[in-house]
C-alpha cells in the first residue's frame, strides 16, 4: 500500500476551537483507489478532519496536500479546480428541499460544468442510475423519499462531476441493516467501476468488516493507528479493544465471516 500514490497527505494538523484542542499533530494519508474508514469516539473530531481536508475549515496548523498540491497555497481558481475532483456526501444528505431529485443532481453540472439545463438533467439521470435509484424517484422532492433513497440521491449528486475522491460522512447512519448493507456494496461497486478513492467516516462495524481497505482510529487528538482491520483491531488501546472486540464488534466479524464463506 505504501508504494501507491497518495491522493491526500495531511501532516501536523492542529484544529482548535478556543481553548479546546481537537487535533494536535495529526498525520493521515489516503491512497489512490482505497477505501479508508475513519473511526473514533464522540468528540474525536472526525467531521472536523473531513471539513479541514475538503476546505470548509482551515486548520490552525499543519499541511494538507491533495493530488500533491498544498490547498492553502493555491489561488482561488486553482483551488476550485482541485475541489471539483471531490464528491461529498454529508451525513444528512443536504439536498435542497425545493428542488426535485433530478434538479438536485443537475445543479452542480449547471453551476460548475456549464451545461445547459437539458443536458444537465439528462446526465443527472445517468448519475441517479449509478446510485441505484429508480426512474420513478427522479421527479420527487426530498420530503417524499425514504432515508435510503435520500442517501442514494445525495450520492448521485456527489458523483455528478465525476470526482476522483469520494468523501462520505456516516453514509449508513439511519438506515436499516438491509439498506446499510446494500449501500456498502454500492460504494464498493462504484469504487471498483470508477476507480474512486474513498474517505469514509463511520460508526458502522459491518461497513468496516466488509468494504474497507484500511482503518484510521482518531484518539488522543491524533491518528492513533492506521492500517488494515486485522492490524488495527490488535492495537493495545482500551477504546479499540472495546470497539472491535465488544459484543457488536464480535457480531460484525461473525457476519462478515459468514458472508465470505457464502461467496
Where are these regions (language model features)?
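Helix-to-loop junction immediately C-terminal to a conserved catalytic motif
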Residues: 54
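The feature captures the beta-strand-to-loop junction immediately N-terminal to the Walker
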Residues: 39-41
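Conserved ABC ATPase signature
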Residues: 141-145, 149
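Conserved ABC ATPase "signature" region
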Residues: 70, 118-136
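A short, proline-enriched helix->beta-strand linker immediately N-terminal to the Walker B motif
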Residues: 160-164
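Catalytic Walker B motif of ABC-type/P-loop ATPase nucleotide-binding domains
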Residues: 166-169
Amino acid at each position: 500500500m505504501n508504494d501507491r500514490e497518495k491522493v491526500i497527505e495531511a501532516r501536523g494538523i492542529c484544529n482548535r476551537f478556543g481553548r479546546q484542542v481537537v487535533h494536535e499533530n495529526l498525520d493521515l494519508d489516503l491512497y489512490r483507489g482505497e477505501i479508508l474508514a475513519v473511526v473514533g469516539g464522540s468528540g474525536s473530531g472526525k467531521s472536523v478532519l473531513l471539513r479541514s481536508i475538503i476546505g470548509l475549515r482551515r486548520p490552525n496548523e499543519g499541511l494538507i496536500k491533495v493530488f500533491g498540491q498544498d490547498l492553502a497555497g493555491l489561488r482561488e481558481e486553482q483551488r476550485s479546480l482541485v475541489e471539483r475532483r471531490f464528491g461529498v456526501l454529508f451525513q444528512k444528505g443536504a439536498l435542497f428541499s425545493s428542488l426535485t431529485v433530478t434538479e438536485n443532481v443537475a445543479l452542480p453540472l449547471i453551476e460548475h460544468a456549464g451545461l445547459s439545463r437539458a443536458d444537465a438533467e439528462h446526465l443527472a439521470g445517468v448519475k441517479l442510475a449509478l446510485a441505484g435509484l429508480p426512474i420513478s424517484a427522479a421527479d420527487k422532492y426530498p420530503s417524499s423519499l425514504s432515508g435510503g433513497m435520500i442517501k442514494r440521491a445525495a450520492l448521485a449528486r456527489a458523483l455528478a462531476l465525476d470526482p476522483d475522491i469520494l468523501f462520505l460522512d456516516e453514509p449508513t447512519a439511519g438506515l436499516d441493516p438491509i439498506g446499510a448493507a446494500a449501500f456498502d456494496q454500492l460504494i464498493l461497486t462504484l469504487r471498483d467501476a470508477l476507480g474512486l478513492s474513498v474517505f469514509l467516516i463511520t460508526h458502522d462495524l459491518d461497513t468496516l468488516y466488509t468494504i474497507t481497505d484500511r482503518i484510521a482510529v482518531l484518539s488522543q487528538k491524533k491518528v492513533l493507528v492506521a492500517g488494515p482491520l486485522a492490524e488495527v483491531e490488535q492495537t493495545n488501546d482500551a477504546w479499540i479493544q472495546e470497539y472491535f472486540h465488544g459484543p457488536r464488534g464480535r457480531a460484525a466479524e461473525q457476519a462478515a465471516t459468514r458472508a465470505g464463506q457464502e461467496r
